[in-house]
Amino acid sequence: MSIVVSPLISLMQDQVTALNNTVGNSIDRDGGKTDIACFLGSGQIDKTVEERVFRGEYKIVFVTPEKISFRDDEFSSSTTSSSVFMQRLQSLKTMNKIGLIAIDEAHCISQWGHDFRVSYKRLAVLRDQLPGIPIMALTATAVKHVREDISKTLKLNNPYIATNSVDRPNLRIQCHRKVDFS
């Protein structure tokens, strides 16, 4: 399974729906349809989803940084203090069920980033408690010192960094005068 950390609940819900409607909904051995992706976080209404995650029923699990970084002891500054959720992720790791952790909007990790969030800074717990699982940090807006801060925070060893030009010839802006304002 792949775990995708993202800050935007509505976007994650849209991505889960799109994945399940296109790639997902394969027929299981009992003749029913199964989803391949799910969302875990405060916006999740179905309380059985988390149990299904830990039974390995999904290929892609979208979570908020708060879900990952929450500690049962919120007053501890240690990244080794873990939540029940993190302990359950460790069990999945032990069973070789987690293949990748992807962190979207990774610029939120850096205090220098334009959308800094404390819960993102705490994602260092992933490297500490789930060693050996590849971590991919994704952002479209990180300058060099923010990328360095992301690498340092997530304890990425010799990361491959792919950058591209900000010139996007495939995008354009057009302005049209609106004559009728009604």
List each language-model region with its residue ranges.
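Hydrophobic residues at beta-strand termini and immediately following loops
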Residues: 40-41, 63, 138, 162, ...
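Conserved helix/coil segment N-terminal to the catalytic DExD/H
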Residues: 17, 43-100, 108-114
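Conserved RecA-like helicase motor-core motifs
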Residues: 24-44, 158-165
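Short, flexible loop segments at the rims of nucleotide/cofactor-binding pockets, characterized by
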Residues: 36-42, 111-115, 175-180
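Conserved Walker A/P-loop ATP-binding site and its immediately adjacent core
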Residues: 1-23, 38-45, 64-69, 141-147
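Post-DEXD/H (motif II) to motif III coupling segment of the RecA-like Helicase ATP-binding lobe
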Residues: 88-163
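Conserved interdomain linker/interface between the two RecA-like ATPase lobes of SF2 helicase motors
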Residues: 151-153, 159-182
